[in-house]
Amino acid sequence: MFDLNITHEVNELLKQVRKGLRNKGYKESKSRTNRYIGTIHLNYITEYFIKGNLVFEIERDLSNSTITTRLHYNGKEHKEIRLADILSLA
């Protein structure tokens, strides 16, 4: 895909999480943010997996190769979670 600087192991885990969530009936939505604030370049890809009141958010910052995962419940951010824990919580 377009995960240029993220390690192979993390990419494989992302693929497993995406596939697992789709298999559990979650719908996928993506957004991309690419903008400059002063001299800072922001380049994010955010994926949402939605089922009922639960939303798993996977935000990838392509500028510095970080991944943030969050669980939302009833429209509010519940907590940040580890990528490896998503399937056990879904």
Name the predicted role of every residue range:
Residues 14-16, 37, 46, 74:
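Short, flexible coil/linker segments at or flanking structured domains
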Residues 16, 25, 29, 78-81:
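Intrinsic disorder/low-complexity segments enriched in polar/small residues
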Residues 28-66:
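Amphipathic, interaction-prone secondary-structure segments
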Residues 1-24:
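Terminal, regulation- and interaction-focused segments at domain boundaries
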Residues 52-89:
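Intrinsically disordered, low-complexity regulatory segments enriched in Ser/Thr/Pro
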Residues 21, 48-49, 71:
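Short aromatic-centered micro-motifs
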